[in-house]
Amino acid sequence: AIPAPKRFGAPVFVSRPYSIGETESEERAAYVSLNLRVGGQLDPVEYSAYQALDYVLLKAPGALLHDALIEEGFGDDVYGGYANGIREPYFQITAKHLRREQKDSFLRRVRELLTEIAEDGLDHEMLLAAINMAEFRAREANFGSAPKGLVYGLQSFESWIYDADPCLH
């Protein structure tokens, strides 16, 4: 089995340069990403719950977190979601094309919005839509051009490599 990774004792901030096109401005070229370790990979209920949150917060039309951050001027796009299939899954929220000086206000606003959402609750219709989508995908098992056997095999590794039931997810 793959051992658990060593945890950070405190938040880690990383800044790296990247290339932009000659016609692009450096003024709004920053990307800021908040990545939070969440839940337990080997808990199928949490696994499903975070997938639903991913949809409601970032991917659905009218997604709560996505739309609020865009409306407040935090970049041209906000994306991310639940990264699963690893021992310590994480939830990522990334804004692209911000000004560098927006980093701290972006991180603060994300935490404020998540707190507000936790206190006020989720829109039940959006949550039901997320659950219905997940159920439909599971029943249809339509993986596009990928063979079902291959997809199921890869999914089994999400828990099997950690000595858990390969049929967990």
Model-predicted regions and their roles:
Residues A164-H169:
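Short, intrinsically disordered, charge-balanced linker/junction segments flanking boundaries
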Residues A1-P44, Y55-R108, D123-Q155:
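Non-catalytic beta-strand/loop surface segments
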Residues I117-G121:
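Inter-helical turn/loop segments and adjacent helix faces that build the functional surface
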Residues W160-I161:
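Catalytic nucleophile-loop/oxyanion-hole region of alpha/beta-hydrolase
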